[in-house]
Amino acid sequence: MENRRFLRTEALLGHEGMERLRGARVMVVGLGAVGGYALEALARAGVGHLTLVDFDVFDESNINRQILALSSTVGRRKTEVARERVLDINPDCDVKIIETFVNADTLPQLLAEPVDYVVDAIDALNPKCCLMETLYRNGIPFISSMGAALKTDVSRIGLRRLSRTENCSLARFVRKRLKRRGVDIGKIVRSEEHTS
C-alpha cells in the first residue's frame, strides 16, 4: 500500500519540494514550548532527518504550554519524548538526540555532523548567544525565537530583523551581546506584544 502520510504536503510543495523535505537535515535546539511546536510542524511536514537537542526533563508545570508535556511524560527526558513523538508521526524519519546543555564546550559535538538548518528555541541568554554566533560564523542557516513568556496575542508574532525588535527584553540583550561580538543576525521570530 502506498504511504499516504504526506500526500497533502506533496500536493502543496510538489514532488521535488517533498523530496527536499525528506532529504533535509534540521536541528531543533530546545524542546520546550517553542521548540516542541516547531518540531511538531517539521515532523508533520515530512522532514526526513531531525536532530533534537535538550538537557532537561518534563515537569508538571510544563503541561499548560508545551505540546510534548503530558501527565505521562512528567519526569522523562525531553529528547526521548520528542523522538518517540516524531517516530509516531513519521516512522521513516531519521531522529538523533543529543542530551546536553548548549555552551562553547558542547557546540562542537552539536555541529559534528552536517546540518541544513537549525531552529534555535533556547530561552536562556548565554547559550542562545553562543549558538547564534557559532551558526552565524559557520554560515549555517537558522531561525531564532526570542522571548514569549507572558505573551498571549498571537497576532503580534512574526519575523523581524533582530536590530529592529521592540518590547522583548531577551531580544534586546541578545542584540547588544551579539553586536559587541561583531555578529549581525538577520530575521528572528519575536512578539511585539507589551507585557505588564
Q: Would you name each region that the model predicts?
A:
Residues 1-27:
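N-terminal charged helix/coil linker that caps or initiates catalytic domains
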Residues 117-165:
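ADP-ribose/adenylate-binding Rossmann-like module
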Residues 47, 52-90:
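Glycine-rich phosphate-binding loop and adjoining beta1-alpha1-beta2 segment
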Residues 28-30, 53:
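Conserved N-terminal Rossmann-fold NAD(P)-binding element of oxidoreductases
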Residues 193-195:
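Conserved small/polar residues in nucleotide/adenosyl-binding loops
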